[in-house]
Swiss-Prot record:
Alphabetically ordered keywords of this record: Carbohydrate metabolism, Copper, Disulfide bond, Glycoprotein, Metal-binding, Methylation, Oxidoreductase, Polysaccharide degradation, Secreted, Signal
One GO MF term: oxidoreductase activity
Record GO biological process: polysaccharide catabolic process
Bound cofactor: record note: Binds 1 copper ion per subunit.
Protein name: AA13 family lytic polysaccharide monooxygenase NCU08746
Organism: Neurospora crassa (strain ATCC 24698 / 74-OR23-1A / CBS 708.71 / DSM 1257 / FGSC 987)
Function: Starch-active lytic polysaccharide monooxygenase that oxidizes the C1 position of starch substrates, but not in cellulose or chitin. Catalysis by LPMOs requires the reduction of the active-site copper from Cu(II) to Cu(I) by a reducing agent and H(2)O(2) or O(2) as a cosubstrate.
Length: 385
């Protein structure tokens, strides 16, 4: 009993410290920060709650699956001018994609995290309707649905899916479908920042600078013109849970579209999405949004297995624009028109100021399939590895 009292007191004393939010794909929280409305995107906190060792015990309350930031009084469960009105990225069912969140330097309290997709479109639509704020009962119902739709770490071939070093076998946290941070008290590569071991400032936070935490997820065999990817981080040291979400679309590839669309529960329409009678796009404008910190004079190119990306020749690759680049958000972008259904592998490269030295990303190659749908444009989010 003494331990419990001390633990609660300790957690209460340091609850202001843990901070993090979803950054790739662009979450509603990130969009709120980039619009200048959220002055602390890492501060959407559900507290005090039981966050450990049972990582699914806590009810989400007003935080919902998308998060509530009490510091700036923003409820991300409701669409607003700068978020929630349309997907920020389109994925293909069955694809493996990069996802990333940002943990603040002063707020890395270890723990475990998960990515989730709720396949109850009627319920999700309550979080997509402009002017409507879901009730707490609807928020919890959605959270329960997202929990059922957890995208297991183990679904991605070759991905390391360890058990948390801060959890003991037999505890509720002893599961590797969720992703784990490194040991909270590790001597090196500690906590969540140790997952990528990226440099301080590799992602944006307002308190002390952030560290990226990057993983891969497999998109489920589900089609939606507009749905949500929810992120949940349970802190190990503090009684806190962090939630955020991103608006996404999921299309089927040529082999699965007919099969998946035949199930009435997975086909989605909305005022923002083309109807089923639209003409499929022959070519798609694929925008690559890539985060990569560079030195003065360096540039970024995308090089790949198809001719439009230089056929693996760095000199023939597509140069990305740094027009939106900032120190806190080192964004490089390029848009390439590609035939629908095109499958390819690719990497990003850094080119020196003289153009003579080229640094390639680490293996493995990235892969992508251009959606075959009515959408004429899609965005692909990533960061340097």
């Amino acid at each position: 009993m003494k331990f419990s009292i001390i633990s609660v007191a300790l957690a209460s004393a340091i609850t202001v410290d843990a901070h993090g939010y979803l950054t790739i794909p662009f979450s509603r929280t990130r969009l709120g920060a980039e619009a200048g409305l959220d002055t602390c995107p890492e501060c959407s906190i559900l507290e005090p709650v039981t966050a450990w060792p049972n990582v699914t015990e806590a009810k989400v309350g007003r935080s919902g699956p998308c998060g509530y930031n009490a510091r700036v009084s923003i409820d991300y469960n409701q669409p607003a001018t700068n978020w929630g009105n349309s997907p920020v990225v389109t994925y293909t069912a069955g694809d493996t994609v990069d996802v990333q969140w940002c943990v603040d330097h002063n707020g890395d309290h270890g723990g475990m995290f998960s990515y989730r997709i709720c396949q109850d479109q009627e319920l999700v639509n309550k979080f997509l309707t402009p002017g409507y704020l879901p009730t707490e009962a609807e928020k919890q119902a959605a959270e329960d649905c997202f929990e059922k739709g957890t995208l297991p770490c183990t679904d991605v071939n070759g991905q390391s899916c360890d058990f948390s070093p801060d959890c003991q076998q037999g505890q509720a946290c002893w599961r590797n479908d969720w992703f784990t941070c490194n040991a909270f008290q590790a001597d090196s590569r500690r906590g969540c920042q140790g997952v990528d071991n990226a440099a301080l400032g590799s992602c944006f936070t307002t308190i002390a600078g952030g560290y990226t935490v990057t993983k891969k997820i497999k998109i489920p065999n589900y089609i939606s013109g507009h749905t949500l990817l929810s992120f949940r981080w349970n802190s190990f040291q503090t009684a806190q849970v962090y939630l955020s979400c991103a608006d996404i679309a999921i299309v089927g590839d040529s082999a699965s579209t007919t099969k998946v669309s035949a199930t009435a529960t997975t086909l989605v329409t909305s005022s923002k999405t083309a109807s089923a009678s639209c003409t499929p796009a022959a070519t798609v404008a694929v925008t690559f949004n890539h985060l990569a910190s560079t030195s003065y004079g360096e540039s970024i190119k995308i090089v790949g297995s198809i001719s439009q990306l230089g056929s693996w020749s760095a000199s023939s690759g597509v140069a990305l624009s740094a027009s939106q680049y900032t120190t806190s958000n080192p964004l490089w972008t390029a848009t390439v028109s590609l035939p629908a259904g095109t499958k390819f592998e690719y990497k990003f490269v850094k080119v020196s100021s003289e153009g003579s030295a080229v640094t390639w990303e680490s293996d493995p190659n990235r892969s992508y399939t251009v959606p075959q749908s009515c959408a004429e444009s899609v965005a692909v989010e990533s960061s340097w590895k």
